[in-house]
């Protein structure tokens, strides 16, 4: 077991790649470390895979082991379970730049498993996992057109930061991950604090330039490993079948792709496909229906792309820069705290906003440390939105990814907890889909939040851009349809305000996307975004002045920190009874800030008065109306404030000499008492006699 090791300096970090010791039965395996964050990636590919498929079965699994952070998992079973949301998102992050680098005809099964085995809380493992995956695929011998590099880019005070630490990211205006080969950007994922198009494009170019050290180092590493390449070749193209299909279907496809209605268009294409298959199979028994279907799909792609490059109208009749018809409605659901129905062409999102207390915040316990999330955005894509039947259950990877993208788009305009002390949950139900449903969710979320009375810094809109490129000719498309996304060369989603970008996601399927093309796409996206924002502002010019009558209103008071235990009580008994009796939710922070959430002013006032009574200080010389709670031979104990009793000595009951306390006082009797003294131990001396004298004098 002789390891092959390659180390290189990457910005402020040292990266080490190692293979040859672990997982030697896998096709390839690499341990990648970056300043104590270590990710182990295994790749297994089936070389002699003869199974007939019409897709590439690439699976990427990313898992974080708690032992990496020196922790034992919580829960009953004390072991890692289903992937967390962050693990799912990082798996998608690895998959997206890797998938387009396998050749079109490659259908062999490939599985990538990335395992975080050691974590430095300051070094994010996602970039490390992507570098390790690139290295493992590059030494696997599979027909992988890599390697890829990866970089995280921050932006602070006009300077770009390469692979900023967790602490540096907290004050950065940008969190962008970019991945690509030596000559092409393939994937961008980012959230930003309302930055200009030029700054965002500069970040992409900066990250791609800086990651070239990774690409070159992996090439050197792969050359040292020197694993033989697979003996794989793409299936030969049946030119006679291509010609026959073009004769039978091309003109009909050109007609079908002028039908603007999605359902009618799909019906027409389905009919053409079925008829051509039937005719060709009848004329040549050696042909297979599956092969004919693949060739028909390729012809569809050619037809759509050729029309766009020639400057002909798009599938639905629009020109490249046009946006589909918009319909914006707010307050569509009577009992939700905020709601909106956003429709763009045949894409529609019903979005709701719900306000809760800080107790409703999501606690995320990851190997990077525990954190609270006070803003949740969930995206649901039911099968009916595309006119299909299907399983309805827990969210799939795509739904988790689209939800996080929409959240990134809105996050920059959300108020701070100090400005708006609520936990906010937004849910986007996609009710119709024909392209760009995640960006419809951004628009709907902005509207629903404003409808709920959340004081956003600005309205946010999102738009999906596409690209068709043939040789040196290219056309950038605004507001792409599902078919244009599927048949095009780029999916480019931008969310932002009138002032700048809040989120950018880019997936590129081809090489040769220049800075010029990205600049044109960003500028075209800005024009589209401003158009959508204008329509949104006409429907709801500004947020509601007040929150919904059905939302909890949060009232804040301050108490002495020494009194916190009095409000909470033994085992939480006092605060629990307060919540139950007043119908409120009460939260107490360590600095004595008390937040009372109630749906009515009466409930809030009741809770506030009770808390004030519980925390009130006993003042010497003040007269209180109290209740006798216990009699003793030497006097009576009187409750003057919640949880605070004082002693009326037998000599302080009245002017006459008292022989027996019970002759003058009964348990439960209300009496007026004057506070004579509070000693160092907090014991209170009371007097009924002096209270009576003072009352008489007044």
Curated annotation (Swiss-Prot):
Domain annotation S1 motif: ranges: 621-689
Pfam families from the UniProt entry: KH_1 (PF00013), PNPase (PF03726), RNase_PH (PF01138), RNase_PH_C (PF03725), S1 (PF00575)
Start and end residues of each KH domain: 552-611
Subcellular compartments: Cytoplasm
Top enzyme class: transferase
Cofactors, names only: Mg(2+)
Family of this protein: Belongs to the polyribonucleotide nucleotidyltransferase family.
Protein name: Polyribonucleotide nucleotidyltransferase
